[in-house]
Amino acid sequence: MPELKKIGFVGLGAMGFGMASQLLKNGFHVAAVDTRSEVKPRWIDGGGAWCDSPSATAIDADAIVVMVVNSEQVDAVLFGGNGALKSLRKGSVVIVASTVSPSYSKGLGKQLSEAGYLYLDAPVSGGVVGAESGSLSIMASGCDAAFEAGEPLLRAMATKIYRVGAEAGLGSVVKTVNQLLAGAHITLAAEAMAFGTRAGVDPNVLYEVISHSAGSSWMFNDRVPHMLAGDFTPRSAVNIFVKDLGIVLDVGQELKFPLPMAALAHQIFVAAAAAGLGAQDDSAVVKLFQNLSGASVSQTRSER
């Protein structure tokens, strides 16, 4: 297995910062960039190197990790005027951890292969806590050479690494399925909490009972405490699920596969975004149900 020493990392957002920090903790030299310069001091204080462009992060790098919002940003990071591929050595591995459509990922894999690079389609799950603790799950696909090159990085960022196939895009298929379930679970948790509260049960009691009952889920246990506290500081924003469930529906259209539950969950997130909640934590969808029903799930209730 080749030894990786210098890593370029693009995207120090809520999850990206934790992921990049885990690489530092595991002995990698990480040069990073983010569009938000306010993260620069914290990154440098943690031992990371700061760059002004994706191209600069890739100079002398053995690999680059991309953790940005969408496929448009991935394209800009890799192929833009100051894109990473202007500096990245041929034969290096490109790891895209962003949530993108399977068809996009498949096309990107072909494009990178033709340009002389290895590619790992490696979306992640586990939230901010998982990123900060190095306990993410990674659902990755790519050729043997890409896995051999990228595995040390994956192991630094995750405790569960699933190799789901050799074809680029299969990792994104699994992430798409995960996001279908995650989005539906969040909206159902919000609906259920508002429903039970409106019917007269103390929301804290309701959460305690359901979290230890068959109707619970990982998302219920993780997001309902945010709802109860009225703390909608974004760990994963409403707008993220507008995008991700949109990808789910796009894949369904490509396959001619009906996705009625995903479509309904998507519309709830769209409604939340339209109500001005897009930048808030995805658990803020509970506000829609509170406003519709008069229920007060949150200890500090507000309309927006």
Task: Locate predicted features.
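Rossmann-fold dinucleotide-binding core
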Residues: T99-G183
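Interdomain hinge/lid region at the active-site interface
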Residues: S172, L181, S216-Q280, T300-R301
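NAD(P)+-binding Rossmann beta1-loop-alpha1 motif at the extreme N-terminus of oxidoreductases
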Residues: M1-M67, S92, V128
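Hydrophobic beta-strand scaffold residues
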Residues: V30, W50, L118-L120, I161, ...
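Active-site-proximal catalytic alpha-helix in oxidoreductases
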Residues: S133-G134, I138-S141, Y162, A168-A199, ...
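Rossmann-fold NAD(P) dinucleotide-binding segment
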Residues: P54-L118
